[in-house]
C-alpha cells in the first residue's frame, strides 16, 4: 500500500496554473494544501474561479499571509514552520 504524501502548493505568480495543479494532485489520494503568498485571487477570472470551486468542494486547507481574505491567515514565519510538515512543496 502506498504511503499518503503531504503536498504543499505555493501560490504566487502563476495562480491559475497552481490551482489546477492542486486539483490534479488530489487524484493520487495525497493530502494537498494551498499556501497563497502575498496576493489576492481574482475570483472574477474563470481560470481562477473554476479550480477554486473544486478546491472548496474538496475542502482543501488554504493558508494565506494576506489578511483581506476568508482563508486561514498566518504569518510568513508560521508558514515557514508549517511547510516543514510537508513531504513535497510545489512552487508556482
Sequence positions of predicted segments:
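Long, hydrophobic N-terminal alpha-helical segment
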Residues: 1-8, 24-26
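Short, well-ordered alpha-helix to beta-strand connector turns
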Residues: 4, 29, 59, 85-87
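Short, glycine-rich nucleotide/cofactor-binding loops
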Residues: 4-19, 38-43
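Histidine-anchored nucleotide/phosphate-binding helix
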Residues: 14-34
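Short internal beta-strands
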Residues: 32-40, 62-66
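A glycine-rich helix N-cap at a beta->alpha junction
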Residues: 47-76
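C-terminal structural segments of small proteins and small subunits
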Residues: 73-92
